[in-house]
A protein has these predicted regions:
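Transmembrane helix exit motif
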Residues: 68-79, 116-141, 251-264
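Selected transmembrane alpha-helices and immediately adjacent juxtamembrane segments
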Residues: 2-51, 136-186, 216
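Membrane-interface alpha-helices at helix entry/exit sites of multi-pass transporters
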Residues: 50-59, 83-87, 179-190
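Residues within membrane-spanning alpha-helices of integral membrane proteins
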Residues: 17, 60, 115-119, 123, ...
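Hydrophobic alpha-helical transmembrane segments in multi-pass integral membrane proteins
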Residues: 155-165, 200, 205, 253-264
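Selective hydrophobic functional segments
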Residues: 57-113, 117, 197-247
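Residue-level signature of the transmembrane alpha-helical core
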Residues: 21, 25, 29, 60, ...
């Protein structure tokens, strides 16, 4: 980052805050449409030389603003099935807290192959089944289907607290399998993602693992990016969300495979 300081003449702290804001805007834009914004925002936080746990905690602070901005936009436009989402919120909240504080028996190294396999399967399914997620076919979710959704919400909450990036993408997958189109699945997912971020942030604050200034700098960008992204998703509909979804899952796959291979 020294070369940027030389070019701009800006103090280090000011430059870091500006870069986090820009990274937050890109992350918020992508995350508001299909999730996966953490693939941008977490590395940006790590570049500031924060300890990993503090980088994750600071990222949660910024992410909650981005998720909140997108959630408000989707709610105002009637895109959220709140009758279903409100039943899932407690499970996501509890799961995220558990994932953040628990000593998990399986370290991330062993969990990543499972995630890679899931992403490969769903990505190929979306590519070859072109009409999947294009039409909103959902009806009232109840009985066994509701119980499955609750278990899924709990599991994704744990995943968000334990690993993080890609949570929104997996939530969208779950809602599409329930019968929602890409757009409504993205809207529902954003509400749960906001909830899991809030739960995880509470724990990180309690542990003192949040750099507030860095988190708020990225949050400014997150709010702007999330607003633009959610508005664009509503304007363009499921076809846009599908394209961005495939792009993000492909990038996630490449990164996860690379990280897994380099850690062998």
């Amino acid at each position: 980052m020294d070369w940027l300081i030389g070019i701009t003449g800006l103090p280090y702290d000011v430059l870091v805050l500006m870069l986090l804001c820009v990274a937050g805007a890109f992350a918020g834009f992508v995350d508001s449409i299909v999730g996966g914004g953490g693939l941008i925002s977490v590395p940006a936080m790590l570049l500031t030389n924060l300890p990993p746990s503090v980088a994750l905690g600071s990222n949660k602070l910024s992410s909650i603003f981005g998720a909140g901005s997108a959630s408000v936009t989707f709610l105002r436009n009637g895109m959220v099935d709140f009758s279903l989402v409100r039943k899932l919120l407690p499970f996501t909240f509890i799961g995220s807290m558990v994932g953040t504080v628990a000593v998990v028996s399986l370290p991330p190294f062993y969990v990543k192959p499972i995630i890679i396999a899931l992403l490969v399967g769903v990505t190929l399914f979306v590519v070859f089944k072109r009409n999947w997620g294009e039409v909103n076919r959902t009806s009232q979710v109840m009985g066994r289907a509701l119980h499955i959704c609750m278990a899924f919400a709990l599991g994704i909450g744990i995943y968000d607290g334990f690993i993080g990036p890609g949570t929104g993408t997996f939530l969208i997958m779950g809602f599409i399998f329930t019968g929602f189109d890409f757009l409504h699945a993205s809207a529902n997912a954003k509400i749960l993602n906001f909830t899991s971020n809030l739960a995880s942030l509470i724990v990180f604050f309690y542990l003192g693992h949040v750099q507030v200034y860095y988190g708020l700098a990225a949050a400014v960008g997150q709010v702007i990016g999330a607003y633009i992204g959610s508005q664009l998703a509503i304007m363009k509909g499921s076809s846009l969300v599908r394209v961005v979804f495939l792009s993000v899952t492909t990038v996630m796959l490449i990164k996860l495979v690379f990280d897994y291979i380099t850690n062998l």
